[in-house]
From Swiss-Prot:
Species in which this protein is naturally found: Saccharomyces cerevisiae (strain ATCC 204508 / S288c)
GO molecular function list: dolichyl-phosphate-mannose-protein mannosyltransferase activity
Membrane topology, from the record: Multi-pass membrane protein
Localization per record: Endoplasmic reticulum membrane
Name under which the protein is recorded: Dolichyl-phosphate-mannose--protein mannosyltransferase 1
Family: Belongs to the glycosyltransferase 39 family.
Assembly mode: PMT1 and PMT2 form a functional heterodimer. The complex interacts with endoplasmic reticulum proteins EMP24, ERV25, ERP1, ERP2, CDC48, HRD1, USA1, YOS9, ERO1, PDI1, UBR1, Cue4, DFM1 and TED1. Forms also a minor complex with PMT3.
Amino acid sequence: MSEEKTYKRVEQDDPVPELDIKQGPVRPFIVTDPSAELASLRTMVTLKEKLLVACLAVFTAVIRLHGLAWPDSVVFDEVHFGGFASQYIRGTYFMDVHPPLAKMLYAGVASLGGFQGDFDFENIGDSFPSTTPYVLMRFFSASLGALTVILMYMTLRYSGVRMWVALMSAICFAVENSYVTISRYILLDAPLMFFIAAAVYSFKKYEMYPANSLNAYKSLLATGIALGMASSSKWVGLFTVTWVGLLCIWRLWFMIGDLTKSSKSIFKVAFAKLAFLLGVPFALYLVFFYIHFQSLTLDGDGASFFSPEFRSTLKNNKIPQNVVADVGIGSIISLRHLSTMGGYLHSHSHNYPAGSEQQQSTLYPHMDANNDWLLELYNAPGESLTTFQNLTDGTKVRLFHTVTRCRLHSHDHKPPVSESSDWQKEVSCYGYSGFDGDANDDWVVEIDKKNSAPGVAQERVIALDTKFRLRHAMTGCYLFSHEVKLPAWGFEQQEVTCASSGRHDLTLWYVENNSNPLLPEDTKRISYKPASFISKFIESHKKMWHINKNLVEPHVYESQPTSWPFLLRGISYWGENNRNVYLLGNAIVWWAVTAFIGIFGLIVITELFSWQLGKPILKDSKVVNFHVQVIHYLLGFAVHYAPSFLMQRQMFLHHYLPAYYFGILALGHALDIIVSYVFRSKRQMGYAVVITFLAASVYFFKSFSPIIYGTPWTQELCQKSQWLSGWDYNCNTYFSSLEEYKNQTLTKRESQPAATSTVEEITIEGDGPSYEDLMNEDGKKIFKDTEGNELDPEVVKKMLEEEGANILKVEKRAVLE
């Protein structure tokens, strides 16, 4: 029997060929390689289409590039990402929960614009100085936003949508208010969405070619590069990697059933996909982090999140070096907690307000004299030693606080904050001059050999290298700390308790600073070993993950994932001079996507029941392609949306936008099936439906454009636009009429210069100025300790009143508020 070819020629504007189904020895099978003609049907080969795409590009550019210079002050998260660009240019290390690529791109653009990092983007509403190329940085973001629209058009064409429908779908995306808003400012969302769109586009392009062809491999490589760049901008890109991986498994499954494919060719394709779609993204991810570490070489406040080994790779760090190695009785030491960022075992002359009401023992993250402890033998406290005695495993000691002259102490009292925990006891500092202490001051050193450096550090305590536990001799509990903060009375320092259970690593300590008068000057010294690239890479990811999951503080504009598909509320980005910028989606497109997802789900369920009842299913090529492509895109929607329900951190509407992009792609196919199948005998009617939908989308965009561009509006128009109560932009800020704006004088709020700018320093001798005098002066006050760490004014007041602290220096900056 001769083999009959089922593929048939189609019109250029109808790019969905028939499925190529062949009869095998036992069953029919689908030929997975597309027709050689498919690529020509779905790519721009006509002058008309090229001109249409050019017009689309111009239209999109006008929308996104319009008025980028306004607002001329910091908007929303430009506070963070503009500030990070400044840090890159200055080379000062900072901490962020996102990978570095998008931030580095902004820094590169700013550097090309001559930016010296002399503006910190400190507060929303701070006016940009003339030295900050913020328009250029926003232009970069807007350009990526415009290119994303073109990528959507090309993606729809590659997945089988006819030219005119793809064009109108892309225009709907171009006027989607939320995407316009995020692409006009210095935010991570525009680069992220561009890279995700590029990955989707490249993978859909790959599907047009035979699996082992050169064009297919080129498209796979492009997909891998885009996935790497998306993942290197925000971890959301990993969801896109997952989506591509699921589609690869889908296609490989059908390839296994394709009798025209040999096992060798299938393995070759599988290996290529692993290399291009996992290997390339991971390699790029590593490269971008390497550049990140190489660019940020100076120690700064952001580096305080990291280990001493990490910080020792940075210039101007304050990490102790050349520490005396041997620790013994009579040594004055500082004890550092291993597993939290809490810092050093600390005490100060403030008591607990409840419990024993004895002196507080805490963790303090900065170097300070109140971190110093003298090691004493438990049965000879205060005894003068004549020979050096090493601190070994099993030694029973007491820790004498050198500043307040009391000893580390535990007893049967509830801890100050974790009072509901029956496995933790209070740790205090107890004693007074002339008092030798009691048995509740006794602690037994237990060296943790597994976590200590190999060799002598496992036998006796060596500074930095030996990790050990301190067991309370009376109760058997261990000196413990965890990420629980004391209230204001404890200066928000980290709680220290004595734990009879809990995580082992939270009971581990090590000696950082160490001195002993009985050791000779030439005694062996030790320093932190600078972290390798891999160590820094791993540690930075642990910190990113930890900080990200702990972003749980309530926010006035946060929203829950369940509300996102219904656009119940937006986010205020900026508000000044009787104008607002507010993130809100285009309700016409937004709700259409949500409705279509529900309708498509019902259609699929109905079809499955019909098929189960033995009724024939539709085999029309357009319907088949519609189902396949929509399932692909809704799978992308689900992969990007579902993880939001597992996250316990703050969530905002813009977290929905990657999933929403896939929803709009699926909606594009819904519009196409209306034209190509629902109204197949009256296509003009189908096009009329699509044009009506487009017109409604454009109208919504135009009506709500004042909160995109931060332009004048009236109270009446604003109030009429608030369709839902959650659309809570402030209409009272607007004037009653547009005429009033013509007579308005715009005000500017200048910001403080960056930390590197010149300041007038005045050193104050003696006790310095009083807190009250300083607070009564005009201007913003920033208090810092001697290590440069910013302090809360109320904490400063308490320190001045109760600890005898002094104000040593006043830095005066010329600031216009």
